[in-house]
């Protein structure tokens, strides 16, 4: 529950899948993930910023990736759904796919139906995403080094990744009616300056830009990296998921005393 609790504020139009009601009644809906990360970032923003952003997007980018839209600190939409397999492209997970492609993959497997489903589940969780696109480890630094040497598959993998994140942020900008703040979190979001630069560079037509010196500075902790002329503030904020769990446990323990 803690992993997606923050997403309980999403409206029905964001959580409901267009599938028969019998499956929706059994729990088939969009739950969202990285809730602890989002909660920790909202908490840090409230503590550090004099004016809390009304319209905010959090891009949690790591081995798993999600983008979440928040209005006045409450989640209104997010890219992951029933499982953490969907949404934007990830290290070993594909993100959103045509459902027909999944049926195609099942039919391509040998063995009985259970074996076929198990094989496709493994493909979708461990053999897709950047790993599948590049044909090598999905680590961003490895891919960037390969791309710099002219590896076409690595170049394509990086382009598809940044494009998927850009599309999510751009779509949520429309949904929110504008964007006051973008926050990058997660292993890639916090430590990969080139990835941040590429993603924000794709958003220049929205008046969003970052300062190269601030983006490339070897710093830790919460920091602002947007350029002075940017219409949207851009931050890098550590995802304090462990601390958030500890705070929840402490609160539960106190309530039982």
Residue spans for each PLM region:
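Phosphate/ATP-binding catalytic cores across multiple sugar-kinase/actin-like superfamilies
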Residues: 41-44, 48, 156-177
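Glycine-rich phosphate-binding loops at beta-strand->alpha-helix junctions
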Residues: 62, 180-203
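Beta-strand segments within the central parallel beta-sheet cores of soluble alpha/beta enzyme folds
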Residues: 55-59, 118-126, 181-183
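Conserved phosphate-binding/catalytic loops in two-lobed NTP-binding clefts
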Residues: 193, 197-241
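Glycine-rich phosphate-binding loop of actin/hexokinase-like ATP-binding domains
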Residues: 6-107
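A mobile "lid/hinge" subdomain adjacent to the ATP/sugar-phosphate binding pocket shared
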Residues: 109-157
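Conserved active-site and cofactor/substrate-binding residues in soluble primary-metabolism enzymes
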Residues: 33-36, 40, 65, 96-100, ...
């Amino acid at each position: 529950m803690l992993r997606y609790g923050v997403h309980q504020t999403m409206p029905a139009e964001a959580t409901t899948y267009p599938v028969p009601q019998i499956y929706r009644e059994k729990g088939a809906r969009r739950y969202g993930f990285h809730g602890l990360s989002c909660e920790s970032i909202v908490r840090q923003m409230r503590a550090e910023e004099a004016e809390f952003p009304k319209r905010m997007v959090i891009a949690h980018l790591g081995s798993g990736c999600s983008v979440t839209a928040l209005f006045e600190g409450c989640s209104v939409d997010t890219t992951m759904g029933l499982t953490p397999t969907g949404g934007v492209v990830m290290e070993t997970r594909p993100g959103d796919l045509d459902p027909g492609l999944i049926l195609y993959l099942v039919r391509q497997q040998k063995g009985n139906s259970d074996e076929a489903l198990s094989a496709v589940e493994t493909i979708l969780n461990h053999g897709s995403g950047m790993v599948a696109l590049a044909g090598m480890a999905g680590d961003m630094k490895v891919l960037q080094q390969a791309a710099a040497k002219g590896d076409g598959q690595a170049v394509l993998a990086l382009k598809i990744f940044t494009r998927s994140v850009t599309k999510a942020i751009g779509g949520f900008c429309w949904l929110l009616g504008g964007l006051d703040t973008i926050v990058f979190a997660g292993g890639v979001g916090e430590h990969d300056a080139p990835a941040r630069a590429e993603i924000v560079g794709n958003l220049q037509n929205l008046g969003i830009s970052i300062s190269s010196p601030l983006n490339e500075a070897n710093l830790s902790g919460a920091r602002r990296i947007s350029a002075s002329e940017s219409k949207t503030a851009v931050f890098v904020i550590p995802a304090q998921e462990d601390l958030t769990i500890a705070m929840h446990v402490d609160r539960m323990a106190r309530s039982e005393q």
